[in-house]
Amino acid sequence: MKKPILAICLVLVVVLSVLLLRAQPIDLSITQVYVSNLIEWRQSNAWLLVVLYALGYIVVTALSLPLATWMTLVAGALFGFWQGFLLVSFASSIGATLAFLAARYLLSDWVRGWLGTRFGSINEGVAKDGAFYLFTLRMIPILPFFAINLLMGLTSMRAGTFFVVSQVGMLAGTAVYVNAGTQLAALDSLSGIVSAPLVVSFALLGLFPWGARILINFIKRQKIYSGYKRPTAFDRNLIVIGAGAAGLVCAYIAAATKAKVTLVEAHKMGGDCLNYGCIPSKAIIKSAKIADQMRHADRYGLEPMSPKVVFSEVMARVRQVVADIAPHDSVKRYSDLGVEVLEGYARIVDPWTVEIALHAGGTQRLSTRAIIIATGAQPFVPPLPGIDKVGYLTSDTLWETLQNREEAPRRLVVLGGGPVGSELAQSFARLGSNVTLIEMASRIMIREDAEVSDLVQASFEADGIRVLTGHKAVRCGVTEAEKWIDIVHENATHKIAFDEMIVAVGRSPRLKGFGLEQLGIEIGRVVETNAYLETLYPNILAAGDVAGPYQFTHTAGHQAWFATINALFGGVKRFKADYRVIPWATFTDPEVGRVGLSEAEARETGIAYEVTRYGIDDLDRAIADSAAEGFVKVLTVPGKDRILGVTIVGAQAGDLLAEFVLAMKHGLGLNKILGTIHIYPTLAEANKYAAGAWRRAHINGQLLSIVAKFHSWRRG
């Protein structure tokens, strides 16, 4: 309660002060009289006047009272130019900083909650360009002094930066007003102090840093390209390296705009998602789910039975699913769309030239106005001692290695409890493997809230999976033809024997062999890009897993639009990649879907929120389907229906999430979802009931009391 009370008190002080000033307005003639009296008093109280003046100026600016202009003039009249200039410069900056800190203390929580996830992106912009913005605003004296103080206080700008930039930015304006104050007795009005030409001059001076920045960037760009000869004509408008989720969309968009585009792929069209990731994993998840339903058919009033799992036939179905989808991403389809598809290894020779070592033999060099790197990612294998000896599997290799096995691996270790490891662990357990899931973190699916991890882990354990969290793998080996892995937990080492091990601890971008190092393009965990997905060279862009920060197929396609449009039309208009609403799902049983903030993320970032939770065990359709487990959890701005984040755990969570993704993207609140008809009986009603739970928690009790009395009166 302290903050609201303090805020109300400060507002009352400011309002009363303003009302008093309006009742006794200050004009130039009154100021001149006050100054003449103070000049006489100054003769015997010089230092006291300096201290009182400085304190008064600080209070006026800290409380945002409309007296700063008059006090600046008075400084020139009382103390002369240099002493007045120094006094005003420091006092105004100190007062402004106090107002800045007060706004941060009193209002920042409210603003964080109101802006939600956008607050983080605003602060990123302030961290990068905040000093430039502030300097520009300070240089233009007609912009409200108090407004700048309050607005900047709501950002993450450091107080020290604010003080220094404010003081430097206000020097010119301070000098003008203090100098005018030295001639206060001769002034007839304030209009001559800040004339239109002077305001324009200040504005131009304020814009100078931005102009200088543009010039510097232009010079840097010219320097970057200086070692290369730009072609006078180009063979292509765009060359895309990689035909995965991002590369295919890039090529599709470019062809749709009638650009001449070449798509280069070194391995399989469709990339990891089609051939090793999303599609094959979902195919095996479905087979595993059917096997589980057969074992538990009594849930549906049927006789349970143990399914006969011929693992090679399951893998044959996986291959067939991939083959059925492959035409969507095929060379023929994209050729028919107008894309030139070349199969081979691409290497960027210079900013406008790509050399392709063709699988069919020979090499081909093409010049291009723009290049998009969309080379994807590959499984990361930790450098454990002995890991190569045991013959580990990854999400890339397991499909081919295990395709002819009649049975699933009897003893399977899955290293990593993230989305990939979790999905594969449950699938293989349901298909007959004895699975041990090893996770170094304190819980599986660490990106989600703890209650999500707990619910999924309980499901895993019901499927017979041994879940070992907080266990660190330290070495692997083979003893008497038996493979093993050592893990450490609470300083104790344990040995686990296995027949096969799947490594699923993450994925690393493919960065080597494309000529990036030779061009000086920075690569770390990903290719370094700016907000427009441009690399060091503005005509070379990156999209998808290789660019980060997300590793989802749908995000790769999302980035592809920005990368392609910026590559083709960046000279006219560029677009910053928009990551404000990024959904994802983990297809375990139960499924987990999320968009926006989790509770843990909201707490870590200091964003105020309310939680509304609806248990799916209450949902009619879920009960009818014998799938009455899970929940819908919605985070909203306190007291408002604006959605900050949603987590859904339960059957078809990934599908149910789409309604909230749409709502967040287009600024629709829970009231809109509540007011939308949902078909009965469907799982989608869970979203509406969650919105209803929020509405019930925000019913106006006084209004209900009035309505109850109205009904009582109507009954007579």
What are the language-model segments listed below?
Residues 278, 375-434, 438, 517-536:
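Glycine-rich dinucleotide-binding loop and its adjacent helix/turn
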Residues 241-243, 255-267, 279, 283-287, ...:
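Flexible, glycine-rich terminal cap/loop adjacent to redox cofactors
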Residues 236-263, 421-430:
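N-terminal Rossmann-like FAD-binding beta1-loop-alpha1 element of flavoenzymes
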Residues 320-327, 331, 400, 408-413, ...:
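Rossmann-like dinucleotide-binding cores of NAD(P)H-dependent redox enzymes
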Residues 388-406, 495-573, 658-659:
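FAD-site-proximal beta/loop scaffold in flavoenzymes
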Residues 281-319, 576-577:
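Glycine-rich active-site loop/strand segments that organize a redox cofactor
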